[in-house]
């Protein structure tokens, strides 16, 4: 089976590509830049191309192939500074990909959305796929709009689409200074002897899911998900910023480091709590996350200590 992974050299995409290769698929990764050191050695084809270039997408897609779309040009925090850019940098290319997928006749297109932003403030926890969607960030609004376009193409043009909505992914390859990823940023602050900044009394509550579990969930949805369906990928367990810091305290103490916290006023654009219910995918195929937050956080800490610079 030929599988094309757009955005497959990134933080999540590189793990997805490895899962696909292990499943016996022939994988082609599409990225805007040459592959990094952690992906260059993997046995797959690589194409430098831009999602926004429809001619390039038309050339890369093949009849009967699978497509996984992980490409996105912005992050939630920076989307507030230029909402128009967030929209224009992401929506046209995503819609163009859907059109090209219909034209070429792909076997299935899996869209990676955002479980952490599209639902907005929670009515109940954990959040199921049927929860109302009311995003309060430009990033979440654009992500949800792309979801709607994908489902519209399924209903009106028979495009076989599956949408997955991961919670907050983390892992050792996550960069700490991109404006996305509290765990990596907190570890970086400790190792750099800087204050960890949290907004509000305890910070936000998030469902942290290890990137390897996101990758296995994407593969499970690709293989067992229903066309036109949406699946959350999460642990169902929430942790506040202070909970995370409490887990980091013994790790820091073991190396003689101290943790300093700076409390800042709450921000209006932060969703207070986001915890996902992934029972739908579990019922479909038995998928469940494997890595606990404590285990994953320790893995990140140990990796940060053994690298030449902070994460």
Residue ranges and their predicted role:
Residues 81-96, 108, 117, 121-163, ...:
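Catalytic helix-loop patch of NAD(P)-dependent Rossmann-fold dehydrogenases
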């Amino acid at each position: 089976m030929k599988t094309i992974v757009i955005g497959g050299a990134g933080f999540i995409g590189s793990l997805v590509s490895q899962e696909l290769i292990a499943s016996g698929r022939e994988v082609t990764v599409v990225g805007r830049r040459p592959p990094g050191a952690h992906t260059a050695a993997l046995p797959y084809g690589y194409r430098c191309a831009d999602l926004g270039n429809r001619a390039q997408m038309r050339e890369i897609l093949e009849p009967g192939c699978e497509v996984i779309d992980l490409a996105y040009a912005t992050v939630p925090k920076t989307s507030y500074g230029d909402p128009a850019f967030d929209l224009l940098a992401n929506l046209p290319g995503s819609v163009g990909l859907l059109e090209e997928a219909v034209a070429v006749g792909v076997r299935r297109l899996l869209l990676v959305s955002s479980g952490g932003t599209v639902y907005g403030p929670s009515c109940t926890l954990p959040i199921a796929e049927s929860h109302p969607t009311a995003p309060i960030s430009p990033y979440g609004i654009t992500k949800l709009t792309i979801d709607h376009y994908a489902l519209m193409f399924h209903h009106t043009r028979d495009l076989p689409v599956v949408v997955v909505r991961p919670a907050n992914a983390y892992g050792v390859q996550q960069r700490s200074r991109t404006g996305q990823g509290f765990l990596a940023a907190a570890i970086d602050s400790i190792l750099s002897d800087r204050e960890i900044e949290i907004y509000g009394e305890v910070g936000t509550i998030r469902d942290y899911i290890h990137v390897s579990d996101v990758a296995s969930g994407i593969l499970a949805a690709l293989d067992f998900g229903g066309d036109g369906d949406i699946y959350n990928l999460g642990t169902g367990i929430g942790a506040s910023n202070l909970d995370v810091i409490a887990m980091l305290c013994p790790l820091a103490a073991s190396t003689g480091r101290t943790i300093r916290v700076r409390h800042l006023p709450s921000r209006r654009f932060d969703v207070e709590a986001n915890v996902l219910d992934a029972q739908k995918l579990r019922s479909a195929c038995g998928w469940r996350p494997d890595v606990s937050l404590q285990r994953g956080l320790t893995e990140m800490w140990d990796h940060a200590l053994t690298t030449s610079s902070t994460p």
